[in-house]
């Protein structure tokens, strides 16, 4: 049985490949595929944002090689950044509760 971390890694890989390749390179996400992934897999995150250009900004920030596609490495950077932001938020909430 895989560990929780191994399960999380498997989930990242599976989610990425469930959305990549329908519009071109099967190992990369196009802008449309990224938008579909974000809407389906990060619904709560997107609903809490007020910026209608958020997906465009995320794409521009992630697309480090400027090929208008997001590869798996670039995708993992997004997930890591969001995870850090969530962790920071929860730490702040914990600090407020303990005061």
Swiss-Prot record:
Chain positions recorded as Ca(2+) 1 binding sites: 20, 23, 25, 28, 33
Q: What induces it?
A: Induced by poly(I:C) in gut but not in spleen. Induced following infection with spring viremia of carp virus (SVCV). Down-regulated following infection with bacterial pathogen Edwardsiella tarda.
- Note whether Amino-acid biosynthesis occurs among the keywords: no
Positions bound to Ca(2+) 2? 63, 65, 67, 69, 74
Listed InterPro entries:
EF-hand-dom_pair, EF_Hand_1_Ca_BS, EF_hand_dom, S100/CaBP7/8-like_CS, S100_Ca-bd_sub, S100Z
Instruction: Tell me the superkingdom of the source.
Output: Eukaryota
In what residue span(s) does the EF-hand domain sit? Answer: 13-48, 50-85
Task: Please verify whether the record's keywords include RNA-binding.
Answer: no
* A Pfam match: S_100
GO MF entry, a single one:
calcium-dependent protein binding
Regarding tissue, the record states: In larva at 5 days post-fertilization, shows very restricted expression only in a few large cells of the olfactory placode. More widely expressed in the adult. Expressed at higher levels in gut than in spleen, head kidney and gill.
This protein's UniProt keywords: Calcium, Metal-binding, Repeat
CDD domains annotated for this entry?
S-100Z (cd05026)
Q: Which residues form a coiled coil?
A: none
**PANTHER family per the record?**
PROTEIN S100-A1-RELATED, S100 CALCIUM-BINDING PROTEIN
Quaternary data: Homodimer. Homodimers may assemble into larger stable oligomers.
List the protein's name. Protein S100-Z
Q: Which organism is it from?
A: Danio rerio
């Amino acid at each position: 049985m895989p560990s929780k971390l191994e399960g999380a890694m498997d989930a990242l890989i599976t989610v990425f490949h469930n959305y990549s390749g329908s519009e071109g390179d099967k190992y990369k996400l196009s802008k449309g595929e990224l938008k579909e992934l974000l809407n389906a897999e990060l619904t709560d995150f997107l609903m809490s944002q007020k910026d209608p250009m958020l997906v465009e900004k995320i794409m521009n920030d992630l697309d480090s090689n400027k090929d208008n596609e997001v590869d798996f490495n670039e995708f993992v950077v997004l997930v890591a950044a969001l995870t850090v932001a969530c962790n920071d938020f929860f730490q702040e909430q914990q600090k407020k509760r303990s005061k």
